[in-house]
Amino acid sequence: MKMELLIKAFIMGIVEGLTEFLPISSTGHLIIVGSFIKFTGKFATMFEIVIQLGAILAVVYYFKDKILSSLKALKPGEWGFNLWYKTFIAFLPAAIIGILTHHYIEEHLFSPFTVAIALIVGAIMMIVIEDIFGKKYKIDNMDKVSTSKAFWIGVAQVMSLFPGMSRSASTIMGGMLVGLSVRAAAEFSFFLAIPTMLAATGFELVKNITSMSLLEWEALAVGFIMSFITALIVVDKFLAYLKRHVLKPFAYYRLLVGVLMLFLIAQKIVK
């Protein structure tokens, strides 16, 4: 029993790290894989949110030089202050809506069917937005994002509260809509992930910390470690990929996964 849970945690940690920062929905993939390996239930739902902490720390480590430099320039008007202020402004919309709708989303929207629909809808949006705005960008550096543009990227992030939309996809699309290059949008998306995912992870830990067993803590540790290692590799490779390539392959992949999920649901393989 113990080894079985730890193996499942190992697998789910890798899935989280692979998918969290790609615009393909980590939630969708965790639901699919969780259904196949029979990792479901209350602990599984909490586990999938908390192991995001490993992915967050991977981003912190990847941007450590920029983060440390920004923390040395926190006087009003300095670039570090401006960066974190804009990140906070972008964080607020999803934070407020998330607090107000958390219970409803958790009880009614965390299902394979809703995730499949979100994967497909998000894929279509990615294709359309890239076709229209992909080469019309005016901002190629996240440091040049204005406060108003940061706010609208934050508004776009609200879409990611719907399971399957993908936080990464929502914020990258939002960035492109307000004039960022896909790479600049991705970098801002990763920075924005730090407060957003820390808040979500902290909220779940506070709710469940007193009711977890030692074995569940061990499973969380395994998932956390694998999520960190895998996400660190993915962030580096994804940003390098965006220097020369576009998002459409990820959109087509989302379409494929969404249709596959609908088929598996119809066959009652995934419930």
From Swiss-Prot:
- Which residues span the membrane? 5-25, 43-63, 80-100, 109-129, 145-165, 186-206, 215-235, 246-266
Q: State the reactions this protein catalyses.
A: di-trans,octa-cis-undecaprenyl diphosphate + H2O = di-trans,octa-cis-undecaprenyl phosphate + phosphate + H(+)
* One MF annotation (Gene Ontology) recorded for this entry: undecaprenyl-diphosphatase activity
Show the InterPro entries listed in the entry: UppP
Its localization reads: Cell membrane
Any Pfam family matching the protein: BacA
Q: Which family does it belong to?
A: Belongs to the UppP family.
Task: Quote the function comment for this protein.
Answer: Catalyzes the dephosphorylation of undecaprenyl diphosphate (UPP). Confers resistance to bacitracin.
The protein here is known as: Undecaprenyl-diphosphatase
Annotated organism of origin: Caldanaerobacter subterraneus subsp. tengcongensis (strain DSM 15242 / JCM 11007 / NBRC 100824 / MB4) (Thermoanaerobacter tengcongensis)
Q: What does the organism's lineage look like at the top?
A: Bacteria, Bacillati, Bacillota, Clostridia, Thermoanaerobacterales
